[in-house]
Design a protein with these regions (language model features):
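Catalytic glycan-binding domains that act on GlcNAc-containing polysaccharides
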Residues: 1-23, 32-36, 41, 50-56, ...
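TPR-adjacent "capping" and linker segments in tetratricopeptide-repeat scaffold/adaptor proteins
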Residues: 10-15, 109-122
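N-terminal pre-domains immediately preceding structured catalytic cores
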Residues: 46-48, 56, 131
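Long, contiguous interaction/recruitment modules in multidomain scaffold/adaptor proteins
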Residues: 86-90, 95-104
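Short coil/linker segments at helix-helix boundaries
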Residues: 103-115, 186-188
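Extracytoplasmic low-complexity/disordered linkers and repeat tracts associated with LysM-containing
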Residues: 113-116, 127, 349
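Alpha-helical segment of the N-proximal tetratricopeptide repeat
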Residues: 122-139, 143-146
Length: 358
């Protein structure tokens, strides 16, 4: 596996970065070759720029330096990774350092009115407003994320505040994700709080928001190619089962038109999975995305992550479906951010504890 991953004959690009990281992980985890792993992780770090990837590089460099007793350098690597506390690996590094939440993540940014923005009279912005009035949210998002490609921090805040003022979290997230590509973090827009968190008493509000954010980006109109519907992207067959369990009349139409109905059924299904896996958020999140059958297969291959002797971090890295692996990471990182934003206080970062149990 190492030979195939490391002899890629590439010098840059996304595939180069992925293969360098994989070569480093194999070297450290399976070959007991930390110095070799360090070289690959450094190559990966130099090849990437996004917050998620930079945090990933810092975390694994910290791990390999910790393994070779270079504790001072490991702390520096973890600290660099922890600068990206909105990310999965940034939170792993923060947890390793015993850090609490960065206050900027739950303090609302300086509220700048979009009405005073430099772009307010531009054709693209005016078109986005018309699309919003016509309830064409996907097209509205296209226009606003295009604008976000070139705006500075303050103008991005103003643009996201239009979406916030008009209760369009789907567009807020799109703007924030575009800003994050340039290293500009807008926490309120990146992790918008919605009243949907109160629609079910079966799950903590941060879990509902984290799942809905990943599933639909809080877009009630979302429909997947597989036929999953609405905020929680629940399949009609699953929704029918959950409606029967809750004593509700099943309505496919309401899955898209009634956000409370959608969230109640989606939350009931996720809660069923959490109970099935005896409180494991990690297994329940993976099953919500890939299905319980696949998760049970992975447990046979890689062990039970509820076992204290099994690393939940390594278990996540071994999820063979890239989509599910990424899904678990994105939902997990959102949990802590939503928890502190809802409560308005700094809390110790506890990502691995969240994955281990509910």
């Amino acid at each position: 596996a190492y030979y195939l991953a490391s002899n890629h004959q590439l010098s840059d690009g996304a595939d180069y970065a992925d293969l360098e990281w994989l070569s480093g992980y194999i070297s450290m985890t399976y070959l007991n070759a930390p110095n070799q792993a360090r070289l690959h992780f450094k190559n990966f770090n130099e090849a990437v720029s996004s917050p998620i990837s930079k945090a990933r590089a810092g975390y694994w460099l910290g791990k390999v330096n910790e393994k070779t007793n270079q504790f001072e350098q490991a702390a520096k690597d973890y600290k660099l990774s922890a600068n990206f506390q909105i990310t999965y690996y940034g939170q792993l590094s923060s947890e390793r350092l015993g850090l609490t939440s960065n206050q900027s993540l739950f303090d609302n940014e300086n509220v700048l009115s979009w009405k005073t923005a430099s772009f307010v009279n531009e054709t693209v912005f005016q078109a986005a407003i018309l699309l919003h009035k016509a309830k064409k949210l996907v097209m509205m998002k296209w226009f606003m994320t295009h604008m976000a490609e070139t705006l500075d921090h303050n103008e991005l805040l103003k643009l996201s505040n239009y979406a916030y003022d008009h209760n369009v979290p789907y567009v807020e997230i799109g703007i924030a994700k575009e800003a994050a590509k340039r290293g500009i973090i807008l926490p309120r827009a990146y992790f918008p709080i919605s009243e949907i968190s109160t629609y079910s008493n079966e799950l903590p509000p941060e879990v509902i928001l984290a799942i809905a954010r990943r599933e639909s980006e809080l877009n009630m109109d979302a429909i997947s190619p597989a036929g999953a519907i609405g905020l929680m992207q629940i399949l009609p067959t699953t929704a029918r089962q959950m409606s029967k369990k809750l004593g509700l009349k099943f309505s496919k139409k309401k899955l898209k038109s009634d956000s409370k109905y959608n969230v109640r059924l989606g939350s009931a299904y996720l809660n069923k999975l959490i109970e099935m896996y005896e409180g494991s958020y990690l297994l329940a999140f993976a099953a919500y995305n890939a299905g319980p059958r696949k998760v049970n297969e992975w447990m046979k291959l890689y062990g039970d992550p509820r076992d204290p002797l099994i690393s939940v971090v390594d278990w996540v890295e071994h999820i063979p479906y890239k989509e599910t692996r990424n899904y678990v990471m994105r939902v997990a990182e959102s949990l802590h951010i939503y928890r502190i934003r809802i409560n308005g206080v700094a809390l110790p970062v506890s990502l691995t504890k969240d994955l281990k149990k509910s």
